[in-house]
UniProtKB/Swiss-Prot annotation:
GO terms for molecular function: GTP binding; GTPase activity; translation release factor activity, codon nonspecific; translation release factor activity, codon specific. Residues 11-280 form the tr-type G domain. Coiled coil: none annotated. Its main location: cytoplasm. Keywords: Cytoplasm, GTP-binding, Nucleotide-binding, Protein biosynthesis. It is found in: Cytoplasm. This is Peptide chain release factor 3. It comes from Gloeobacter violaceus (strain ATCC 29082 / PCC 7421).
């Protein structure tokens, strides 16, 4: 393949993740982006989803029962000749690890904000991750059809709390019950929307210039006068639109709308494919890897077991970073040093799947994984390389997981191992091998519920969960191996090992950790497992 052809394919890719606090409307926005992208012909509302229809991105049984997203899902579709790779992330804060891994595979982020609530805790945390990665952030302020805070107040909060400049690409016309549409500041056009039943179909829209008499008639005089005044204010005091600052993550384009009613969704999607970053370079141990480099490379950012209940297989999600992926290609697996044939490669759309013949930088490919891959693994052609690893979040909740049925222990251990490998939970073990019950370590309590639910539904194993009083963990390293044999133990601590045999110590309080670290200055204490 010639470089111009490769560059053209890469230039068509737009890969992004949606970040938000729970209940900001992320699942609804995802569905509406798919609706306007032509990937589905009817959007399923949350209310309908609880009865018959399930959101396209929510495929796991527990997600369908509870109406929440607890895993990241890949949704791919073509819109206006652009290949869109939409990485739908968990909305629940207990699953921030999965979201972090997904953001490692994204080139852009869409930050979703509830107009009534503004910046919330999870939004801020995930924004900080995006900022650390330096990726562009596009903001969609949702639920303008409900009572909410003033738009100027919301913009001010984004600037002050998140420390990023804002440029409202469009501006709401009305609020709550009077929300009619938006003014597009870049195109200088008014977009007035009509509601559809349940928001299942695209919203009819009337478009015209702000000075068009027809548009003035459709808006009442008070609304028209207010929108003209607010636009003049924005033009006079706001920062200018600068695509380079957007690409650097220093300026966020802001869009107003209502995902439930389809107001402003297409304007957001159109602007996104116009301004979003294309796949960029990636840092590896051999240097910077260009997306248009001839040799294929990619990394595993997610592993999901039992996506297909009929086959009980495991899928490794690979973000393509350079070159061209081809079905049945044999690649170098950097961690093991072995050659691996990628014979079963899939394009995924929620639970649906089809064979992938080729893919380019920015694309996400699913590969049936018989246990070869782990999260963070690099695969490549040409000179061996390794991309930067994906760290874990420090766990804050711990519990012993027991198997009450000895005859099911093999199945129990298989399930726990596979769920650990896909990042559903961290698993620790007693140093005394006679104590076989694993200790689960999680960022949030809901992770425990998911593990138990999946062990029962997918592996047919019943479990007993016993919460533990520990609140923090530290991985221990030392310059000299013998130093690990001469630890001065603090009485209120517990020494364990992780799946790779590395020493981990649990503490009940930060004070206990402080005592332990002061007693052992020759040791290094790490919040997360060293890469």
């Amino acid at each position: 393949m010639s470089n111009p052809t490769l560059a053209a394919e890469v230039g068509r890719r737009r890969t992004f993740a949606i970040i938000s606090h729970p209940d900001a409307g992320k699942t609804t926005l995802t569905e509406k982006l798919l609706l306007y992208g032509g990937a589905i012909d009817m959007a399923g509302s949350v209310r309908a989803r609880r009865n018959q229809r399930h959101a396209t991105s929510d495929w796991m049984a527990m997600e369908q029962q509870r109406g929440i997203s607890i895993t990241s899902t890949v949704l791919q579709f073509v819109y206006r000749d652009c290949q869109i790779n939409l990485l739908d992330t968990p909305g629940h804060q207990d699953f921030s690890e999965d979201t972090y891994r997904t953001l490692a595979a994204a080139d852009n982020a869409a930050m979703l904000i509830d107009a009534a609530k503004g910046i919330e805790a999870q939004t801020r945390k995930l924004f900080d991750v995006c900022r650390m990665r330096g990726i562009p952030i596009f903001t969609f302020i949702n639920k303008l059809d409900r009572p909410g805070r003033e738009p100027l107040e919301l913009l001010d909060e984004i600037e002050k709390v998140l420390g990023i400049d804002v440029y409202p690409v469009n501006w709401p016309i009305g609020m709550g019950d009077t929300f009619r549409g938006v003014f597009d500041r870049l195109e200088h056009t008014v977009h007035l929307f009509d509601r559809t039943t349940g928001g299942k179909k695209m919203a009819p829209v009337t478009v015209g210039a702000i000075g068009d008499e027809r548009m003035r008639v459709l808006m009442d005089e008070g609304t028209y006068a207010q929108i003209v005044e607010e636009i003049e204010l924005l033009d006079g005091v706001g920062v200018p639109f600068d695509i380079e600052r957007v690409a650097q993550g220093k300026l966020t384009p802001v869009f107003f709308g209502s995902a439930a009613n389809n107001f402003g969704v297409q304007l957001f999607l159109d602007a996104f494919i116009r301004f979003a970053s294309r796949p960029g370079t990636r840092s590896a141990n051999t240097g910077v890897i260009s997306p248009v480099a001839e040799d294929f490379s990619g990394f595993v950012f997610k592993i999901q077991a039992n996506m297909d209940p009929q086959h009980r297989d495991r899928v490794a999600f690979i973000r393509v970073c350079s070159g061209k992926f081809e079905k049945d290609m044999t690649v170098h697996h950097t961690r093991s040093g072995k050659k691996v044939r990628l014979s079963r490669s899939l394009k995924l759309f929620g639970q649906e799947r089809e064979t992938v013949e080729e893919a380019y930088a920015g694309d996400i490919v699913g590969v049936i994984n018989p246990g070869t891959f782990a999260i963070g693994d690099t695969i490549c052609l040409g000179k061996p390389l390794a991309f930067e690893g994906i760290p874990l979040f420090p766990p804050e909740h711990f519990a012993t997981l027991r198997n009450p049925n000895p005859s099911k222990y093999k199945q129990f251990l298989k399930g726990v191992t596979q769920l650990r490998e896909e990042g559903a939970v961290q698993v620790l073990f007693h140093q005394d091998e006679a104590k076989r019950d694993p200790i689960l370590a999680a960022v949030g309590q809901l992770q425990f519920d998911v593990v138990r639910f999946r062990l029962e539904s997918e592996y047919h194993v019943e479990t007993i969960l016993e919460p533990l009083p520990w609140t923090l963990a530290r991985w221990i390293t030392a310059k000299q191996l013998e130093d690990l044999e001469t630890i001065d133990w603090y009485f209120d601590s517990l020494g364990l090992k992780d799946h790779e045999g590395r020493l981990v110590i649990l503490f009940k309080t930060p004070w206990g950790f402080q005592q332990m670290s002061e007693r052992n200055p020759h040791l290094q204490f790490h919040e997360i497992a060293p890469l």
